[in-house]
Structures are given as structure tokens and as C-alpha cells.
Design a protein with these regions (language model features):
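N-terminal secretory targeting signals
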Residues: 1-41, 152
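Bacterial extracytoplasmic/cell-wall-associated proteins, especially those involved in peptidoglycan
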Residues: 27-152
């Protein structure tokens, strides 16, 4: 029970910090609950992409995929928010599946844990691309982790 309370408190703190860091205030003033809902949506999207892209790659494998999304959000060549990075055409093919939509609405606990860990301390701040069949023809190869090849 204590662990669930700690996890809840940590997720609220992370949501508040993410809200503060995001551009959510740029359009119109938001209440904390509206901001928290927006950030929880991002957490669920990150958990879903981690599950569907790397759910069989262990915690670090999922974290590398989450890092890819977070690094893209900060990179000027990509959209500046989690939703648009994940749904950008021809990037994460899993978004077109029913399984992805299920993962968004019912995220796995281990995937949420991976997101929260990644938001607390990012495992890698360089990765922008990954591929399951070898290094892509674009970007600079960085490393292979289990079945995925990561590049910047």
C-alpha cells in the first residue's frame, strides 16, 4: 500500500513538473487538474509506445524507446510535444493498431514504471531513432540494445 501511495505522489509531482516545463501555458491559462490530465495522457502515450515497441525488451529497452520520444520533443526537427511525436506520420507504426489504442487506455504497470523512471532520470539523451532490423540509413549509429538499433 505504501508503494502505491509513493507511486501516486511521484506521478503527481512528475505531472506538475512536466506541466511547468511544457508549453501548455502558452495558449491559455490552465488549472492544475487540466494540466495533470494532459500530462497523464502523455504518460499513457509513452507507456503505450514503450509496450508496443519494446514490451519484450525489458525495462531498459522500454526506457530507450521512451528516451527516443523525449529527445525528439526537445529536438527542433520534430514536433514539440509527446502526442505529435508519437503520431507523426511514418514514425511509430504501432499507433495504427488496435493493440496500441488498448495500451493507451489500459497501460501496463511495468510500462508506467518505465515512463516514471525515465522522466525522473533519462537513460539516454542522444537517441532519436531506433529500428528492429539494423541501423537505419539515416542518423549516426549509437548502440544496439537487445533487438533494437539506436541512432542519433
Amino acid at each position: 500500500m505504501l508503494e502505491k501511495i509513493k507511486l501516486f505522489i511521484l506521478s503527481v509531482i512528475i505531472a506538475i513538473v512536466l506541466c511547468w516545463m511544457s508549453k501548455i501555458y502558452a495558449e491559455e491559462p490552465q488549472t492544475l487538474s487540466t494540466c495533470r490530465e494532459a500530462e497523464m495522457e502523455d504518460i499513457n502515450l509513452l507507456a503505450a509506445v514503450a509496450e508496443r515497441e519494446a514490451g519484450n525488451q525489458g525495462e531498459d529497452g522500454m526506457r530507450y524507446v521512451i528516451s527516443t520520444v523525449l529527445n525528439r520533443v526537445r529536438d527542433k526537427r520534430f514536433p514539440d510535444n509527446v502526442h505529435d511525436v508519437i503520431y507523426q506520420p511514418n514514425q511509430f507504426s504501432v499507433v495504427k493498431t488496435k493493440a496500441f489504442q488498448t495500451a493507451v487506455s489500459q497501460p501496463r504497470g511495468d510500462c508506467i514504471d518505465a515512463v516514471l523512471l525515465e522522466l525522473k532520470e533519462q537513460i539516454n539523451t542522444e537517441v532519436l531513432y531506433f529500428n528492429g532490423g539494423g541501423y537505419p540509413s539515416y542518423g549516426t549509429p549509437l548502440f544496439k540494445y537487445k533487438d533494437h538499433y539506436f541512432s542519433k
